Design a protein with these regions (language model features):
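Hydrophobic positions on the alpha1 helix immediately C-terminal to the Walker A/P-loop
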Residues: 36, 40
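Short glycine-rich substrate-engagement loop in P-loop NTPases that contacts/grips substrate
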Residues: 56-85
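Hydrophobic anchor at the beta1->P-loop junction of P-loop NTPases
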Residues: 25
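Conserved lysine of the Walker
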Residues: 33
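Interdomain motor-coupling "hinge/lid" segment immediately C-terminal to the ATP-binding subdomain
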Residues: 120-122, 127-228, 261-264
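Pre-Walker A adenine-sensing motif
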Residues: 4-18
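Accessory nucleic acid-recognition modules appended to NTPase machines
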Residues: 183-341
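Domain-level recognition of nuclease-like catalytic cores that cleave nucleotide substrates
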Residues: 379-400
Length: 400
């Protein structure tokens, strides 16, 4: 099967090609970063770049283990630079190289060197490294396949949008699993990702000794997607089930899951006071198939699964996303960009009038003129407008 073109991320690399900035792509393991590099390198070759103008190293490959020492890596690359010719340097999973920023910083000041790096966690671009490279890099976070990208893989099959959506949430959005049908293969792959992210990355980095507790916290978060919770509530619930822990431990493990880009924390935003609220947050998962895999749940709570999908799509579209807090209601998502603000309510269906009124109420309380949307699975013959609130079919919105 041909590779799915990840246009959003390819366009990011194209726009910054040959510009005097380091291109950084972060994202959870197996989301497609290495494939993105392969696609982009092929574009370079097709445009006339010669093979010896491309230096590409994947630090997951044992062949390059000796280059995980930063002096050796620097020497290897410098020896392959070509006088008076552009050289494109791709460093994949660069977090395996302690002090890689010294190599990148040194290469950056050399003429005609265009640098691209990837990493599979949030801390590989720690505050110290980010400070060292301030003003010298641009970064994009890569996610597994969007519904639109996933949908494109099934364009030749006679499937409805709804049938493809069901495959999307149950069979995973990780690129390798597209068109994989048997549950056993899907489960094995998801387990391998969890083992890598949880055991190889989080447990090792945080020196966690109670791995079962970490897995229990993951399961709790997956069972409570889209619910307002906090570390104390998680600790108390697990303790009541006989899994004794405390909020400090939960906070530490939560931070590890966020750094591993497996779980996303969405804080509350006081819509009237225009301030972030510290207590309680919602949590979403990078791929909803983990919920089915770890909890053996399929059709239950489809509303919160849909909410999870919408959250990730807003992140893909470049928004900073918050939960909107009001005195008399909650807005699922406040999506912010510079000089731009949008409000979103997400509901699987609002066919019952009481449900429609409940979902519209928080948006109706807003006294500004920013766009307001209600996203549902309901089939609409046109975009419904409820006194300035646009109701859209969520699958149509995801395919925009």
């Amino acid at each position: 099967m041909s590779l799915i073109q990840r246009e959003q991320y390819l366009d990011f690399l194209r726009r910054h090609k040959d510009q005097d900035v380091i291109k950084v792509v972060s994202g959870v393991r197996r989301c497609g970063k290495s494939t993105l590099f392969e696609l982009f390198k092929q574009e370079l070759l097709d445009s006339g770049v010669k093979p010896n103008q491309i230096i590409s190293i994947n630090f997951e490959d044992l062949e390059y283990e000796a280059l995980q020492e930063y002096h050796a890596l620097h020497k290897y690359i410098v020896e392959r630079l070509i006088p008076d010719a552009s050289v494109y340097v791709f460093l994949d999973e660069v977090q395996h190289v302690p002090q890689f920023e010294k190599v990148v910083g040194s290469l950056f000041i050399k003429p005609n060197v265009d640098i691209y790096i990837t990493g599979s966690n949030a801390y590989f671009m720690s505050s110290d490294i980010a400070t060292l490279l301030t003003g010298r890099y641009v970064q994009i976070e890569m996610l597994p396949l969007s519904f639109k990208e996933f949908h494109s893989a099934y364009s030749q099959q006679n499937l409805s949008d709804m049938e493809i959506y069901n495959l999307y949430i149950e069979h995973s959005s990780f690129p390798r699993l597209v068109r994989v049908e048997d549950d056993e293969s899907i489960d094995e792959y998801l387990e391998s990702i969890l083992n890598t992210v949880v055991l190889k990355d989080i447990v090792t980095r945080l020196k966690i000794t109670d791995v079962p507790l970490l897995l229990d916290i993951i399961k709790y978060l997956l069972a409570n997607i889209g619910s307002l919770i906090n570390p104390t509530k998680i600790a108390n619930t697990l303790t009541s089930y006989g899994r004794k822990t405390d909020n400090k431990t939960v906070e530490k493990y939560l931070q590890g899951l966020k750094d591993g880009l497996l779980i996303y924390e969405v804080n509350r935003f006081d819509v009237k006071g225009k301030a972030l609220l510290q207590r309680n947050a919602k949590y979403y998962v990078v791929d909803s198939a983990f919920r089915k895999f770890l909890l053996s749940r399929t059709d239950s709570d489809r509303g919160h699964i849909l909410e999870n999908i919408v959250y990730l799509e807003l992140v893909r579209r470049g928004y900073h996303v918050y939960v909107g807090h009001q005195q008399n209601g909650e807005i699922d998502f406040v999506a912010k960009k510079p000089h731009r603000l949008e409000y979103y309510q997400v509901s699987y269906t609002v066919m019952e009038d009481a449900t429609l009124r409940r979902e519209l109420s928080p948006l109706e309380q807003l006294d500004d003129n920013y766009p307001k949307y209600l996203l549902t699975m309901d089939v609409l013959h046109k975009t419904d407008n409820h006194n300035g609130i646009e109701q859209k079919n969520v699958l149509d919105w995801l395919l925009e």
